[in-house]
Curated annotation (Swiss-Prot):
Family annotation (Pfam families): AA9
Cofactor requirements of the protein: Cu(2+)
Biotechnology: Lignocellulose is the most abundant polymeric composite on Earth and is a recalcitrant but promising renewable substrate for industrial biotechnology applications. Together with cellobiose dehydrogenases (CDHs) an enzymatic system capable of oxidative cellulose cleavage is formed, which increases the efficiency of cellulases and put LPMOs at focus of biofuel research.
Organism expressing this protein natively: Phanerochaete carnosa (strain HHB-10118-sp)
Binding of O2, residues: 162
Keyword Membrane found: no
Catalytic activity: [(1->4)-beta-D-glucosyl]n+m + reduced acceptor + O2 = 4-dehydro-beta-D-glucosyl-[(1->4)-beta-D-glucosyl]n-1 + [(1->4)-beta-D-glucosyl]m + acceptor + H2O
GO cellular component annotations of the record: extracellular region
Protein name as catalogued: AA9 family lytic polysaccharide monooxygenase A
Length: 264
């Protein structure tokens, strides 16, 4: 069998048990505890969003206000930690190559309308962003922008490309797979940079958007890949994909969380 066909078959098999979502966040290297349904607007499953017109493109399925908010300051480091089934397993299948992005929006919007501002993305350098995320135990960091104090949604996005050679509209069993989690974050104190106009999700990603269709298996040069969405906001403060701390919470598949402690 041709290598490309084998690779596609392998990705199909792996995708059945390779999904992911965010467990919680770290602030300046301090674990804020299990955030699922506590300060993370956790979806009921770790399945991806594949329909670009689905309202779940904003904050995944079951977007709603959850009980708590994590307190940060402008210029703090905010780290997302992804997981598969438990906190100590591989966070996603190694076949799920692709980029990572982080957006921010005022919480009052509930993620609706042209409110999402991209503050970080990472595609391919010497390896795909997701490959490096696996090595980093699912942890990637953004620096909290110098935006005014208030409540915000920080939206982490993985775009897995292992089935992105075909549009979802052409084959509902395929298409780019978006793993999305939104964290409720309170910035206090804040800064004086005004967020620019954002994009709407759903809406901004369409079948013709660069980065939605990509064939991992036909020899395409990954350094030419362009991530979906706008460029990173020019006043964003950057981020990285790297391990910031070793999880210490008990290994559990329950959705119960503990109160976040905020920045230390």
């Amino acid at each position: 069998m041709h290598f490309a066909a084998l690779a596609i078959l392998s990705s199909l098999v792996a995708s059945a048990a390779a999904h992911t979502r965010v467990w919680g966040v770290w602030v300046n290297g301090v674990d804020q505890g299990d955030g699922r349904d506590i300060y993370i607007r956790s979806p009921p499953t770790n399945d991806p969003v594949v329909n670009l017109t689905d309202p779940a493109m904003a904050c995944n399925v079951d977007n709603r206000v959850v009980p708590q908010w994590v307190s940060v300051k402008s210029n703090d480091s905010l780290t997302f930690e992804w997981y598969h089934n438990t906190r100590d397993d591989d966070i996603i299948a190694s076949s799920h190559h692709g980029p990572i992005a982080v957006y921010v929006a005022p919480a009052a919007s509930n993620g609706s309308g042209p409110v999402w501002v991209k503050i970080f993305d990472d595609t391919y350098t010497t390896s795909w962003a997701v490959d490096r995320l696996i090595t980093a135990h699912g942890q990637h960091t953004v620096i909290v922008p110098d935006i005014p104090a208030g409540d915000y949604l920080f939206r982490a996005e993985i775009n897995a490309l292992h089935q992105a050679d075909v549009l979802y509209d052409q084959d509902p069993l395929r298409g780019a797979q978006f793993y999305i989690s939104c964290a409720q974050i309170t910035i206090t104190p804040g800064g004086d940079e005004t967020l620019p106009a954002g994009i709407a999700l759903p809406g901004a990603y369409t079948d013709s958007t660069p980065g939605i269709v990509w064939n991992l298996y036909n020899g395409s040069d990954p350094t030419e890949y362009v991530a979906p969405g706008p460029p990173v906001w020019t006043d964003a403060l950057g981020g990285s994909i790297a391990l910031v701390g070793i999880p210490v919470l008990p290994n559990t598949t329950s959705s119960a969380g503990v109160a976040p402690t905020g920045a230390a």
